[in-house]
């Protein structure tokens, strides 16, 4: 893995930690090992601009993904040896995220700020605080200046962040109006999720897809169709072949290997948009936020890594157009109050334990729901979900069989260590590698055992999940003096939530909220105008700096 100098790395991340007002530009290395030097401010306006937005991706989310990669190789982090491309870009800063009416923002207001350079109130997209005046966004500015435009997201393409770059509505939930504005927009390339309400909320309105096709869009729904796209394809709406019930792209942890990744979509967008006109492309990792709302660390890490691989595709493009390109990576807000550290694990992180999780909390919850449909409350048995628990998270109860397997694994380790004394040279090196792997496997085997308190917590969560089979109380108005909302499971499937929570804690991860937080988020950049992105700024300034780097007006008319 290529590294940057420790002195420079300390400076860059100290700037983030203490919120200094300036930070030095430093050289990173690209995927091929080529040094990425700061771009001269004397360069002409950026011809190609790619803005990456990790929805809900705070500093903790980025470092969790970075440290996870180290942990998976049984390595301690090294000074300056950041694993994520976004963490190695030469300009690093922070942006505040508050909205016009709240310290803790939400995605519509934050997306509007990043798209228009103006503050907005909650739940509005592309309009001012009066909810009557449209505010010009970067996509519209870019088109007015002759550039091509692309908008991508792993959320539904009419969700808050992507919609902020082409729509103007007083309510972010007005999906039908947003979809119609997509059809009427001048955006050249859309990709990612589908449309939530193409026939309106009641399903009785005219199908917006017909308007989209009539507007000249080529609509793709398969990986094969996506592969055929190129500069000759004209305007494109590429809908991912695997969508969930919310019309968003399935989580990376649940994605089938044959389905396109966010990096694949980004590579295709760059191929379709590249040309003499230049372009502005916004790429959102929209479901980092969703995973963090669920306090699902393993899924959030994989979503962050998926976004970083998309950034790497943009970096390859940058290396071919160094003096004409600007890449910016930021977030609309942090979600979940993620903490790299938990009281029970003290000063230790065990992020490699997150690798035991094989499905998102949402998929696990669906499997629990499916089980519940086959039982009555009186016949549901905790033991019947233990195999699912193991398959999903690696967590197991302490059984005689597991105890015996752990004892055998420990005995094998002792024998392996003894055998090392009689080996030399290459044979010893190979045996030491095998011994190290065996130690990791043994540690994982022991760590994944449910402690008595954890087992009881899982049983309580199972009971809470199965109680949904019981008739609802007839009372319609709870006594306010007696009613207390149950925040234990965040409104999600209790069995799934508790399983993921226990795994998080075993990894040394904790969460402070099921909602957004007000902490500033990282801003990273490379290319034309990169130095302007260092230090502490506001999210509205991110838009203004991008517009300035592109040579666009920011008058908001």
Which ranges hold each PLM region?
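Compositionally biased, intrinsically disordered low-complexity regions used as flexible
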Residues: 1-3, 505-506
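Bacterial N-terminal signal peptides that target proteins for export
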Residues: 2-14
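Bacterial N-terminal signal peptides
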Residues: 12-24
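Generic N-terminal helix/loop capping motif
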Residues: 19, 26, 60, 92, ...
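Cleaved targeting-peptide boundary
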Residues: 28-33
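Mobile, glycine-rich extracellular loop/lid and propeptide segments
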Residues: 36, 41, 46-64, 114-164, ...
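A post-motif C-terminal structural segment
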Residues: 43-48, 57-112, 159-557
